[in-house]
Swiss-Prot record:
Site for Interaction with host rpoB, residues: 101, 160, 165
Biological processes annotated in GO: DNA-templated transcription termination; transcription antitermination
Pfam families according to UniProt: Antiterm
Name by which UniProt lists this protein: Antitermination protein Q
Record site: Interaction with host RNA polymerase sigma factor RPOD: 134
Superkingdom of the organism of origin: Viruses
Native organism: Bacteriophage PS34
Keyword set, alphabetical order: DNA-binding, Host-virus interaction, Metal-binding, Transcription, Transcription regulation, Transcription termination, Zinc, Zinc-finger
GO molecular function: DNA binding; zinc ion binding
Amino acid sequence: MRLESVAKFHSPKSPMMSDSPRATASDSLSGTDVMAAMGMAQSQAGFGMAAFCGKHELSQNDKQKAINYLMQFAHKVSGKYCGVAKLEGNTKAKVLQVLATFAYADYCRSAATPGARCRNCHGTGRAVDIAKTEQWGRVVEKECGRCKGVGYSRMPASAAYRAVTMLIPNLTQPTWSRTVKPLYDALVVQCHKEESIADNILNAVTR
């Protein structure tokens, strides 16, 4: 069972569910099976499960839990980023909270997010390769160059920058780009890493 099935479980079309064809109905996962598997996955990958469930609007509590997990991670690695490491305690905590909140919002974006769908590929992540289409005489697709194949635009990092400057008024754009934005980007990446870990654990416990 993969994480995507967890989202489907919360709006089921039937009381039984399965990721793949099964020999018999008894091999499918019941609601009790799914809840037990989710509990096991949460105990081993709490960050990833909270991030995913919050992303899919399954729980407002999970959204806040995911941001809290992300803040803990940010505190842990903040010493590597001089623009954050040198900040005073209270200011640093507030900046990390802002970065974690915006990074999680970026992670949550998808082609279904209002206004985020790529205008070039309309959310498919694929675009027509005009040169090869003309060369081969048939439609040839390639990764959409505008969205890099994801089907949607990322949240502009400038939004996080503006929020951080409310706490650090003298933070210039170049300094942000060199010393703070790398941490913001790392937080977004960490969300995806934690989701992948949770997905693998959930798959393992439901085999």
